[in-house]
């Protein structure tokens, strides 16, 4: 969100009663992710921003007034770690699937894209995710190729990572998967951590099963998070060591049930919810990070804290300004709910706008050639060249 001075002036004027707001949401039950309380209140918007929240705004002038009649309002959810390419669709199609469910932002690691197309592939993702009603932040893949044994389509070295870190929507260096190299104090791997820190961005982790001295050594590098915990003991050890714990529930790796006891208010801002990899069938049937919020609540997690772990905590971890909460000055990303426990979105506002969103579909970065056997069961396989303009083999 590129705010202008006029946006801030408008928000202040609306809050002070000098101008009418763009939208007044009356009689809301607001999920306050700061206090974990439910507030009976009114929410006044000024364009893309929330201007004011409070009982004093029941009769505030606004271009549009919506009486929520006691419905719940939560901040838009943010998926803290996802590989968008696992959905097998473009960012625009992905957004179509998750925004109506209440997901208004994702932090993606385009690891597979980078291993095929390198910097050009990441730049395509940046272009393809621009202007959507889903905000897409990017972490620069740190392991391209994944191992020295692989033959990848590209290599991302320190120079390429440093260049990509300069992009305003890049929020970190993605999961540093080579934990043996980190533990061996490898100069290249530790250099990636330094690049992230010098850019004031987050070096993200990947530390499956690490506990004890190995975990201490891994975190001593400055790596900030991990999403690979599979047991309660492992998750607790990482929390105790100061790691930002990402609780994952993907399509194949599902850890939420094991880690749900750690989703407690006393753990504050140190836990976030992530999907990592979700297949199209699971996105359609279950949803994105909204499914994690629902499931966490079903497992006994306090609803306000489950929502906080899927919004404010992620925003804080990545320093996403004005995101993840419903309060004056925050971006107006709101989810209206008929029932708090089921977390089924009745309406979604993204940057103060409900529906009517654009779904741009950028052209492919290059024509590309895909070799695939014919799908006919009773004929000899043939090799064909896929022509994107025609959408078929020929």
Predicted ranges, named:
Residues 28, 48, 70, 81, ...:
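Divalent metal-coordination and catalytic microenvironments
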Residues 2-14, 92-202, 266:
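Divalent-metal coordination cores built from histidine and acidic residues
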Residues 83-85, 111-113, 141-146, 176-179, ...:
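Active-site beta-loop-alpha junctions enriched in small/polar residues
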């Amino acid at each position: 969100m590129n705010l202008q001075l006029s946006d801030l002036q408008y928000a202040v004027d609306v809050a002070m009663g000098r101008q009418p707001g763009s939208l007044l949401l009356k009689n809301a039950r607001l999920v306050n992710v700061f206090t974990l309380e439910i507030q009976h209140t009114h929410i006044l918007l000024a364009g893309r921003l929330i201007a004011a929240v409070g009982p004093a705004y029941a009769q505030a002038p606004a271009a549009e007034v919506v009486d929520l009649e006691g419905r719940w309002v939560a901040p838009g959810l943010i998926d803290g770690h996802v590989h968008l390419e696992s959905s097998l669709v473009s960012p625009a199609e992905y957004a179509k699937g998750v925004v109506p469910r209440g997901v208004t932002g994702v932090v993606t690691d385009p690891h597979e894209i980078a291993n095929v197309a390198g910097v050009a592939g990441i730049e395509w993702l940046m272009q393809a995710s621009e202007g959507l009603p889903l905000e897409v932040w990017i972490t620069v893949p740190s392991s391209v190729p994944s191992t020295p044994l692989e033959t990848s389509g590209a290599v991302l070295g320190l120079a390429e990572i440093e260049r990509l870190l300069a992009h305003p929507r890049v929020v970190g260096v993605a999961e540093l998967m080579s934990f043996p190299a980190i533990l061996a104090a490898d100069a290249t791997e530790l250099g990636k951590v330094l690049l992230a820190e010098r850019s004031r961005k987050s070096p993200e982790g990947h530390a499956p099963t690490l506990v004890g001295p190995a975990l201490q050594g891994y975190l001593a590098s400055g790596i900030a998070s991990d999403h690979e915990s599979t047991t309660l003991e492992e998750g607790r050890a990482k929390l105790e060591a100061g790691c930002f714990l990402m609780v994952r529930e993907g399509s194949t790796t599902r850890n939420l049930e094991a880690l749900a006891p750690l989703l407690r208010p006393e753990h504050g801002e140190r836990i976030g919810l992530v999907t990592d990899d979700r297949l199209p069938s699971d996105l359609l049937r279950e949803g994105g990070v909204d499914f994690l919020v629902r499931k966490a609540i079903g497992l006994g997690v306090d609803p306000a804290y489950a929502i906080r772990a899927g919004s404010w905590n992620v925003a804080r971890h990545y320093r996403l300004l004005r995101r993840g909460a419903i309060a004056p000055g925050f971006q107006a990303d709101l989810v209206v709910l008929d029932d708090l426990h089921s977390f089924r979105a009745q309406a979604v506002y993204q940057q103060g706008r409900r529906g009517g969103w654009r779904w741009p579909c950028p052209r492919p970065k290059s024509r590309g050639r895909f070799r695939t056997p014919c799908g006919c069961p009773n004929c000899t396989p043939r090799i064909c060249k896929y022509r994107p303009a025609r959408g078929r083999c020929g």
